[in-house]
Amino acid sequence: MPIAPRRQWDQKNGYCGECSIQQAALYFGTYVSQFVCRAIINTNQQSQLLVAVNAQKVLTALKLNSAEFNYSGYASPQFQSYFGWVKQHLKLLRPVLITAFVKGLSDPDYDHIMLATGITASNFTTYNSTDQLYFNDCFSSQVSIRTASTLNDIRSMLVNGAKYPFCIPTKICYGCAVLGIQDNSARALPVRITLGNWTEPNVIAGVAPSTLSASVSVNGLVVGKSYSLFRYNDYRKVPTANYTASAYSTVRNFVASGTTANFTESIISNGVAIYRCVPTGS
């Protein structure tokens, strides 16, 4: 999936989970600041966003559907079963929040959250040691690529962890796939957001927010048909149907001249901008 890496904030135990959700959300027409992600679970920014704890609460608030890996339903070691689960979601173009140990740290469950965005595989159901996983590690501006056989390790990080900074736990695994937007109308079209900068001004460190330039693309249009692109600056006001009657912030009405339409938008970095595009009148 064409999901560009983004840089996490490091304060308050790190914003890796927030950054991973930010990246996945852009693929579904949603910009959300790392600050807002954490504010959904704790307004004072003290509680981390964690997979298998509160990540789904944030995704649900953003009107995104999700599914977590059922770690309690598999015997240990789980890595191969987990990897097959990740592959199945990536095949369906669903980004996956994956968790990892970090060499030198000590949490018994995991230390870091990253976003898996693609896979090169011989099949899309089971583990194969030669598969290649594409993921954004929330530190590098480049997509990481690792062969499956190099991805996992135990807490001591003495095997694959001796060479790589991040390894998926071998024994117990945690993950959360982002399935798409909540849309009961079944009429909303795919919307993607691309940002011109891979970093977000770190308001936690005292940096002032800025205006981001965003390219908003709508796909699956029918030439000659009329559409409405709704923008919501408050995630609490995003509906799952009846968009025309909703409390949107702005709307662009347009007639499709091709199967894809692109618009340039300005977004305040520490805020929210969520887009829904539907046939006019929906």
What are these regions (language model features)?
Residues 226-230:
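Beta-strand signatures of extracellular beta-sandwich domains
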Residues 257-282:
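C-terminal beta-strand-rich structural cap/linker in extracellular carbohydrate-active enzymes
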